[in-house]
Amino acid sequence: MMRMLKKIAGWSRKKKIIVIICVVLTLVLGATGAVFGYAASKVNKIQKIEVKKETLKESITEEVEHKSGYLNVAVFGLDSRDGSLDKGSRSDTIMIVSLNQETYEVKMVSVYRDTFMRLKDGSYNKANAAYSYFGPDGGVALLNENMDMNIEKYVSVNFNALVDVIDAVGGMDLELTDAEVVHMNNYCVETSEVTGKSYKKIEPEVGGSYHLNGVQAVSYARIRYTDGGDAQRTVRQRIVLLNIMQKLQQMDLTTINKIADSVFPQIATNFSFTEILNYAKDFQKYRVGETLGFPNVRYSKMLSGVGSTEIADTLASNVAEVHQFLFGDTDYQVSGTVKGIDDEINDALSSGKYEEADETEKEDEKSEDKTSEETNHTETNIKVTEDGNTGTDSGGTSEDSSTGSLTVTEPQQPDTETPPDYYEEDYYYGDD
C-alpha cells in the first residue's frame, strides 16, 4: 500500500490524491472494483444514490459514544445484472472500512453475507438481503443497528467493474487447488454470461499456478463451496484485491483514464466530489492494516425458509470485538439496541420459528445443487476463446480447500417493493 502511495511520474499532487482516496474507498476497501478519477468530469459519471437522513437518524444509536478521528465507510460489492446499483441488487461483499485519521491506518471488517441479522424494517434475514430489499439505505442501516456503528457514507461497486479492471491491468497469476479449478470453471459460465466477456476454460481441471483474466479472477473470488465456505470466500476476495494493488503501481495515466470511463458508471456512492477532496489531504500517509471477519465467533445453521446461515455465538460479544479491533476499545459495552437484537435472535431460534430444515428439505437442496453444477459445467451458448489474457505480473496464494457442491441458477428478480417473508438461498441468482 505504501509503495502505491508514492508519486506517479507526471501527475499533479491533486490528481494523485484524488486517485488515492478513490482507490481506498473502492478497490482497496471493497475488493469488488476500482475507481480512478482525477477530475469532476470523471467523478460525475458515478451514480449518486443518497442515504435518507431519517435512515441515518434512526439507525445510529444515540447511546453509543462514537470515537472521533475515524472515517467509517460501508462498501458493497454487488451482483447487478441490469447495471442498477440501488435496491434489487444483491451485495455479495459487505465491508466496513475504518480510516484512523490520526495514525493513518485503514482497517476492514468483512461481514459474512449469510450472517443472520435484523433488517431496517425489523425483520430478520441474511445480511445480503438488506441491500437487495432496501438499497444503500438498508445496507448502511444493517451495519449501524446490528454493530453499533455510525456509518453515513458508502461506496457500491458492480462485479462487472472488477472484471474490467482486472482485464485492464493484465490479469493475475494465482495458485489454485483442484477444487478451486473445478468451481472456478463452473462460475465462469455465469460470470461470462452476465458480463459479456470471454474466458479460457482450464483443462484438465487440476490445481496449479494459472494466469487468470477478469472473468476467471472474479469467478475465483465468488467460490464458496470448499472448506471454509463463506469465510474462505472472503480470503479469496482479499487475494484478488492484493494482486490488483500490485498491478496499480505500474499503470500509466492513459490506462487510468480508460478504466475510469469504463468503471465509474458501475459505481454508486453518496460521497460528493468536494468531500473526496476534503478527506484526501492526508491520504498519502494511509496504510492498509488488518481485516476481521464478522461474526468472528459463530456457528452455521440451516434455517427453514432462509437457508444456510451464519449465526453469531452472541451478537454482543462479536460487536464488542469489532469495536476493540477498529477503535482499540478494550472495555466496549454494546448498546441496548444490539442487546435487544441478540435477545430477539435467540428467542426466534429457540421458539422454532426458523426450525432447522428437515432431512427431505436438505436432500432437495443438495439435489438442486448437484443438478445445477452439472448443467453449468457445459459451456452452452458461451463464447470460450483460446486467448485468456495478457500480462504476467504479480502473483498470489490461496488457502487449501476441498471439493463441494455448487449451484448457479438463472436469476429471478425479487419484488423489491414488497419483499418476501424470507430470503431463500437460491431465490435470487442462486446459492453462490
Residue ranges of predicted features:
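Flexible, polar/acidic helix-loop-strand segments at domain edges
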Residues: 167-255
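Amphipathic, coiled-coil-like alpha-helical scaffolding segments used for oligomerization/assembly
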Residues: 133-196, 270-272, 276
